[in-house]
Amino acid sequence: MKDEKPLILVTNDDGILAPGIRALISVMETIGDVVVVAPDKPQSAMGHAITINNTLFLDKISKDDDTITEYSCSGTPVDCVKLAVNEILKRKPDLCVSGINHGSNSSINVIYSGTMSAAVEAGIEGIQAIGFSLLDFDWNADFEPAKAFVKKITLETLKNKLPPGVVLNVNFPKLSEKEIKGIKVCRQAKAYYAQKFDKRQTPFGKDYYWLTGKFTNEDNGEDTDEWALENGYISVVPVQFDLTAHHTMQQLNTWKLNG
């Protein structure tokens, strides 16, 4: 009797029609049985938002005889994972992959990322999970160089298993496959956005704003994701969703909080 193929949930934040998710699907179908649940429109920078004050709609867009089952969802990337795990799939998936995102999710971007939040939500559900991103915002970005590395990282994750509470944040430099120097396990670089708002007015005199800003990296450590990407490597950062600052607990216990 042949081993059962792994069940793989695929999602993203750029929307179900984005080239990045199509590239990811093409890799995953060589590994296991694939179910896709992704937003029906772009949901970038949604973070871990969920829909609680509006209805959620789910539409099956694949045909019954298609080899891959696909659904589009009116909600956020995290909504997609929640619906997939609790309403669509008959069993818990062996893996959830999110992406391939059009644009970086390295460093501080991981906090804002809908791509990574979908992976984190899967991790919360006890599912092995990986978020993939390419440092190219272009809708016509070339995902071919990333595919072999996506497959390798996916197979290693399925084989070795991540510890509970940990998911992977994988970012690819915008390089050809030959130019990529390899894969580096990294820590998240310390960076921030210098925020700026472009203030404008409607024809009726009402102010409105466009958020802009400049990404600023304050961390030149050679063990960081930003260094790896700038130097031609794929960055792999293990991300945890226990946000407790454990190293600060002892200090807080010296405060006179109860007296």
From Swiss-Prot:
Q: Which UniProt keywords apply?
A: Cytoplasm, Hydrolase, Metal-binding, Nucleotide-binding
Q: Which cofactor does it need?
A: a divalent metal cation
The residues listed in the UniProt record as binding a divalent metal cation, with positions renumbered to this chain, are: 13-14, 44, 101
- Its catalytic activity? a ribonucleoside 5'-phosphate + H2O = a ribonucleoside + phosphate
Keyword Nucleotide-binding in record? yes
- Stored InterPro entries: SurE (IPR030048), SurE-like_Pase/nucleotidase (IPR002828), SurE-like_sf (IPR036523)
Annotated protein name in UniProt: 5'-nucleotidase SurE
Which organism's genome codes for this protein?
A: Flavobacterium johnsoniae (strain ATCC 17061 / DSM 2064 / JCM 8514 / BCRC 14874 / CCUG 350202 / NBRC 14942 / NCIMB 11054 / UW101) (Cytophaga johnsonae)
